[in-house]
């Protein structure tokens, strides 16, 4: 099975200068835990990703104002990505290695085409046993990364 078979196509995205308040509202509306960050409006060139964890650790816990804090201040830059034609096992391995729950999917020119989340693999993936192992590994406690 390939990444393109289970990814969510054309996910909502934001730009580095968006406020984290706006992104949090998009997360709520879309019922997602992460938003890919694209270079600029009308561009799908991936430059980062922002997660609900980033919001909790680097905005709320640090007492920052969500309306004046930009995505670029708290996002993960150059996240690990996969391509639609890569085997799903690559995404599973990356999730386990990097302890991430979501992986942006980009074409060969770096344009965002989708995203894979743990839930996508659990509900659509063929390798449910490996997915369960990966979720267990990802869920182990880790230290907070510096912004």
Identify the residue ranges that each predicted region occupies.
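The conserved cystathionine-beta-synthase
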Residues: 13-32, 38-39, 82-99, 106
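Tandem CBS (Bateman) regulatory domains
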Residues: 1-10, 51-81, 87-96, 117-147
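Short, flexible active-site loop motifs that bind/organize anionic cofactors or intermediates
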Residues: 9-13, 45-46, 81, 111
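A broad "ordered helical/assembly scaffold" signature
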Residues: 10, 22, 26-28, 35, ...
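A glycine-centered beta-loop-beta connector
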Residues: 27-30, 35-54, 95, 103-119
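A broad, low-specificity signal for short, low-complexity segments enriched in glycine/proline
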Residues: 12-13, 40-45, 63-66
């Amino acid at each position: 099975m390939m990444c393109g078979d289970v990814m969510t196509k054309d996910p909502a995205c934001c730009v580095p200068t968006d406020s984290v308040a706006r992104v949090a509202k998009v997360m709520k509306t879309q019922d997602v835990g992460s938003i890919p960050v694209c270079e600029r409006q009308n561009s799908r060139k991936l430059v980062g990703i922002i997660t609900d964890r980033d919001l909790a650790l680097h905005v709320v816990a640090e007492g920052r104002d969500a309306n004046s804090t930009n995505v670029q201040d708290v996002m993960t830059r150059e996240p690990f990505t996969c391509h639609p034609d890569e085997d799903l096992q690559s995404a599973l391995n990356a999730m386990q290695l990097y302890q991430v729950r979501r992986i942006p999917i980009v074409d060969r020119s770096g344009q965002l085409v989708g995203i894979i989340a743990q839930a996508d693999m659990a509900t659509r993936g063929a390798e449910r046993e490996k997915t369960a192992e990966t979720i267990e590994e990802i869920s182990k406690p880790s230290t907070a990364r510096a912004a």
